[in-house]
Amino acid sequence: FIMPDKMSMEKIKALRAVGAKVVVTPTDVEPEDPRSYYSVSRRIAEETPNAFYANQYHNPSNPETHYKTTGPEIWEQTQGDFDVFVAGMGTGGTITGTGRYLKEKKPEMITVGVDPVGSLYYDYFKTGKLTEAHSYKVEGIGEDFLPSTMNFEYVDEVIRVTDKECFDMARRLVRHEGVLCGQSCGASVAGAVKYAEMMGRKM
């Protein structure tokens, strides 16, 4: 299992506890760098017999799975009684697949992506230009390149959040709601609150 060094030690220990071999790679290198987790995972898959390289950044099964499962689950559990769907943006699979399904069911609904400061999605959505990404601590969302699994056709707005906002919201959810979650969940909720406030809702 290959992961960047900004991932929490708890995740690494949990994987090792169930027998996984974990290879930790540096975060602050370009995707093309041979030390990046993209490059290392691809190399290990090529060198390992019977290995499967999921390639979640360019595998159409990623958004398709969310189209077939996550979208219908949200629709069934809410009975379509919602106006906005908010999700963190990492590989783009969740927001692309789920957003596509929900917009087919309810075209007027709004899909909001949440992006950490340091990632390039926010600037790309607003300007159409790729900017240079820089480091951030939130795990699991944000990107320093454009995966083919990210389709902005299904995204209506992108909200930018700071590391502090993500961590603070994750702690708030644990303390006040009893929801044991990580920073990317905190990011999504912080982004949802920001969007609601932008729309004039008091939170």
Predicted features by range, described:
Residues 1, 20-23, 50-53, 83-84, ...:
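Structural motif
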Residues 38, 50, 104-183:
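Active-site/ligand-binding loops adjacent to catalytic centers
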Residues 48-89, 152, 156, 160-179:
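Active-site/ligand-binding-proximal alpha/beta "capping" segment
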